[in-house]
Regions:
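Extreme N-terminal basic, low-complexity initiation segments
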Residues: 2-7
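Preference for intrinsically disordered or flexible, low-complexity segments
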Residues: 9-179
């Protein structure tokens, strides 16, 4: 694994790994459906299973797909859903409203997201649309957590806050607890 080059797309960022056939199989089991638009794996669980998949901005059938980083790991998606159900999105929006530095960082995260997605292809239908409500709202913690896991701490403050609130970590595998 490691960084690689894809014809026409240039070098993958250092944290992205080319998705292998085994990864696609794991992703399909994780998500319960056939995969579309898989470009790379941006983050992995401690056991090696994909945690965040990088998707192309236009999938095979021509549909625009704005979600660059898609959270796939079941324990992570459960935790994001739990945080959303607990109402943390409103709390995080208030934190952004109260903290100009966090708000600026969130706007920068939005721009980073758009830049990375645009490197995979221009899709006019979704131009300026990132994910998770960026740059002004907090709508989907799954997308924001995925961004933080893919890029590391300090890029997306809301994703970082959600990870801190969750107590969940890629460093502790819970993938096979129920097997």
């Amino acid at each position: 694994s490691g960084a690689s080059s894809v014809p026409g797309l240039g070098d993958l960022p250092m944290t992205w790994e080319t998705a292998q056939a085994q990864d696609i199989g794991v992703l399909e089991r994780q998500l319960g459906r056939p995969m579309r638009g898989v470009h790379a794996i941006a983050a992995r669980c401690a056991c090696g299973d994909p945690a965040v998949v990088v998707t192309v901005p236009r999938v095979e059938d021509g549909t625009p797909f704005p979600t660059l980083y898609y959270l796939s790991l079941p324990e992570a998606t459960k935790e994001a859903s739990r945080l959303e159900a607990a109402g943390l999105m409103l709390d995080f929006e208030q934190r952004l409203a109260d903290d100009s530095r966090a708000r600026s960082a969130y706007e920068a995260a939005h721009k980073d997201y758009l830049h990375k997605r645009d490197e995979l292809g221009s899709v006019p239908e979704i131009e300026g649309i990132s994910a998770g409500g960026m740059p002004t709202r907090v709508k989907c913690l799954h997308a924001l957590i995925a961004h933080s896991l893919a890029e590391g701490p300090g890029v997306n403050p809301v994703g970082d806050w959600a990870l801190a609130e969750s107590g969940w970590s890629l460093e502790v595998c819970r993938c096979r607890v129920d097997e």
